[in-house]
């Protein structure tokens, strides 16, 4: 069973409303575009979708047991945080939205927005008391048109190493992105990081992307990590 990939880390970390519409699952022409909905079908910037057909997925409709584990009685705040991070493990249907938001040339005609989707697995690759590493792996099945009308053959899976996120409790040394492919080591005092977790995000080749400190918040209906302001 697949989950919607809703990593609510109020930093926009893979954020976006993912919809359980059958038309999006099947990648037909009637996609529910997440960020480009304001362009209608007659607009020159009307959104477009993927040209391939993917594996049919069955979405979970009930909360996962990992969610309930976060709210067990008697847990410390740190243990709640750890369980929230570990709850990201699993199978997901993820959406990818590409849309130009900044124009550096005048005149300039932006490309039409594009949206596609895929299936992704999240695995913990390191777990200690103060450190958790989660590796994202794309596992894509493509439907190939068969000989008969409306007949499809499911091809072999395409497995792609995707991004990685490392979480460290009360981290005092950050590798902060400072723009133009440069990063700066930033030291923090132990007092300033009390109760906080750093999230370091890495590219598919394990090179750094960005890192930030933040605090987890746990409510009755959601858990969220709020990042401090940082370059991305």
Features from the language model and the residues they span:
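Short, intrinsically disordered, charge-balanced linker/junction segments flanking boundaries
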Residues: 224-232
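Bacterial N-terminal signal peptides
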Residues: 4-14
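Generic short beta-strand segments
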Residues: 93-102, 137-139, 228
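Extended amphipathic alpha-helical segments with heptad-repeat/coiled-coil character used for oligomerization
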Residues: 126-180
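Hydrophobic/aromatic beta-strand elements that line small-molecule binding cavities or substrate pockets
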Residues: 110-112, 116-126, 135, 232
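Sec/Tat signal peptide C-region and signal peptidase I cleavage site
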Residues: 16-19
